[in-house]
Amino acid sequence: PAEKLQAARQTSWRRTAIVSQSGAFLLNRFSQAPEMSPAYLISMGNQTDLTLGDMMRHFISSDEADVIAVYAEGFKDLDGLRFAQAVREAVRNGKQVIFYKAGRTPEGKNATSGHTASLAGDYMVCENCIRQAGAIMARNFTEFQELILLAEAFRNDAVNGKRLGAVSGAGFEAVGMADSIQSDEYSMSLGAYAESTRSAMQSCINEKHLDKLVTIANPLDINPGADDEVHAHMAELMLNDEGIDAVVIGLDPHSPVTHTLAETDVEAFRMDAPGGILERLSAVRERFRKPLVAVVDGGAQFEPFRNALRERNIPVFPVCDRAIATLSLYMEARLMVKGFV
């Protein structure tokens, strides 16, 4: 019903196609993350006519979709191979493919059979084949939609390595970022700053009288006393450093010196204030063609702030470990396909 899922009235859509064997999966993802704004939402059901392989082949040369996201429960006979081949062709054509495969457990396989009459097959075989074809593999539903948002935002950005820059005014968040750079699925590193970067960071810290509280490091804990200018300038310096390939910045929404609220009469907290973090970080994002991800770890009162960042092409996560994990999976997949010819 329109009352439960209102159609967005937009004049333009993102260059994304989401293909799913479940119509409800499509509706729920779009309801949770309307900012995805896909050009196509396609429900395949039990593939009685067109198959997942057919749909992937259609988008290989499409000039309307650069990101293709697929939720699959199973393939028709021999269609899994066609699908993997189409993924490889799509990636070679500059597309980004995001893939979630259902039926990972014996119970899950039985459930897919009852849902779309799909034979789920061996999950690990399927995952390895599609990954090697060049798709970005989502491990859960939340990650699926977050990877779509990263792919949309960073479609034209350079991914040249695995060296992250991390900055936050919350000590636990800086530690959490460092703790999240490696897992069984990915392995990133924290980049080393150039001497000119370290010098510029120290000058900023000295100017703001934070020098007795802040030590230049990666991750960079800039203390809760760091204002919007410090946050944005540190992100700018990191992105400008050739030794850093992407930046994750914690925006400390509860800090008394950051502008992160929409509904407030206190000018010092208003997110639309001139010179606030929204204005400053947007300018930084526009200047550099490297991935920049924000973390806004706070309650519902900060949702307008998160939405405003997303509108400015800055992906936002509610917790730092999810930000690092999703960005890492995305970057490693982008690096892998660089070798495809």
What are the roles of these predicted feature ranges?
Residues 1-341:
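Catalytic-core regions of core metabolic enzymes
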